[in-house]
Amino acid sequence: MFGDRQRPMVLVLGLGESGLAIARWCARHGCRLRVADTRETPPNLAALTAAGVDFEFVGGAFSPALVDGGIELVALSPGLSPLAEDLAPLVAAARERGIPVWGELEFFAQALAALGANGYAPKVIAITGTNGKTTTTSLAGLLCERAGKKVAVAGNISPAMLDKLTEAIDAAALPDVWVLELSSFQLDTAHTFAPDAATILNITQDHLDWHGGFAAYAAAKGRVFGPRTVRVLNRDDAEVMRFAPPAAAADAPRAVTFGLNEPAADGDYGLLRENGIAWLVEAIDRDGADAPAAPSRRRKQEAANPPDIALKRLMPADALRIRGLHNAANALAAYALARAIGLPAAPLLHGLREYRGEPHRVEVIATLDGVDYVDDSKGTNVGATVAALDGLAQRAVLIAGGDGKGQDFEPLAAPVARWCRAVMLIGRDAPALREALADTGVPLADHATLEAAVRAASALAQPGDAVLLSPACASLDMFRNYAHRADVFRSAVEDIALEKGTTL
């Protein structure tokens, strides 16, 4: 359960949702606990006390002295960067003493290994990427359920993995399939995690301050793959395709790709555009044997004799209830993951048609006088906003801005020039956005509030357009969180609807 340690003394750093779950899990298994948080009274302190857990609490600045006194294992909450000025010396001190540093995902992986010794062998699906994780995770969970499996969905999507596992153990209802949404923070401190199938949906700039740079951020995403994990890769993303196994490697894991073009290799997924209809398709080798060769042997055969590929139509893309080409890609990824663990196609396709999407993720909240009002408040980075604009593929008045987290806004310029009638700028980093978009030829307007930006956008939008809130930025400079930002947007749209004599 804890590597080669039976009941170690554990230092839990940070008492957020994940830290609380780790503390409860460790206490459940007889560990001695020291819990530290930079806040003197973190919100979850009362919850941990109420759970009857015996622990020592240390509030205030982190210091290397926290690993003194017999600490054998350090548990790091995902919100805490090991590179942070107050934390780096502590992490260094732990490693100098040979004390492992784990995150919740590593505790979860160790727990599954321990349960596996008693015969528990679930399938594990993992989803990461800069954008699209929650949609793909929720959809993959639904697909597995529709295939008749008992499914647990957890991770970055909430609830915490260890809380979900505890609940399942106590209910004597361990799932057949785990579907996990994983952030780069969670993956950074994983060491033995090895899911059956995993995807990296995309990799664009985000959380660079936490990881110390783009290379480290991308490397953290790559930790989602174990040595035998089926790799489901976005072939439209060059950074993702760096994780494709080498073709010549005899022991290379199986890999399949998805993308918005026609797939060219057996088992890959994509889109076929024919007679004005876009189809979700799977590439099938017409000459393939009923029993497929091992991956390395198959690659050698394909090199000698290129396969005769046919495209099997799965369903029209328009039959998906989630909007945008980026969501077609997410649907293909979820389907590929479910197929990778051996689930039958028919119930999965029914699930794809059923899924309605997640709130605040390219969610059409109203159509007024022919104008769509689209809430993409969860679009907190440049890649998300690029995906929203390209995915909607319609003329838009974009509302963007907030806390840019040190991102480069230049990649927004091309899709803004292609799709935007105008851009309404809000928030702290509006000047940086203005500079990045200055040469697009698209009108730019600054607004002190989101409400003012929505009104101005509504006045400019034409029938067939979208008023798109996709900020490309975090929200904390103006709002409590992205959901609060979405609520303000919705309220402003409701006011406009009332003035037009209707309601949402």
Curated annotation (Swiss-Prot):
GO terms for molecular function: ATP binding; UDP-N-acetylmuramoylalanine-D-glutamate ligase activity. It catalyses: UDP-N-acetyl-alpha-D-muramoyl-L-alanine + D-glutamate + ATP = UDP-N-acetyl-alpha-D-muramoyl-L-alanyl-D-glutamate + ADP + phosphate + H(+). It is an enzyme of class 6 (ligase). Its EC number is 6.3.2.9. GO terms for biological process: cell division; cell wall organization; peptidoglycan biosynthetic process; regulation of cell shape. It is found in: Cytoplasm. GO terms for cellular component: cytoplasm. ATP binds at residues 129-135. InterPro entries: Mur-like_cat_sf, Mur_ligase_C, Mur_ligase_C_dom_sf, Mur_ligase_cen, MurD. Pathway: Cell wall biogenesis; peptidoglycan biosynthesis. Gene3D superfamilies: Mur ligase, C-terminal domain, Mur-like, catalytic domain, NAD(P)-binding Rossmann-like Domain. Its main location: cytoplasm. Keywords: ATP-binding, Cell cycle, Cell division, Cell shape, Cell wall biogenesis/degradation, Cytoplasm, Ligase, Nucleotide-binding, Peptidoglycan synthesis. NCBIfam families: murD. Cell wall formation. Catalyzes the addition of glutamate to the nucleotide precursor UDP-N-acetylmuramoyl-L-alanine (UMA). Belongs to the MurCDEF family. This is UDP-N-acetylmuramoylalanine--D-glutamate ligase. It comes from Burkholderia pseudomallei (strain K96243). The lineage of its organism: Bacteria, Pseudomonadati, Pseudomonadota, Betaproteobacteria, Burkholderiales. The gene is murD.
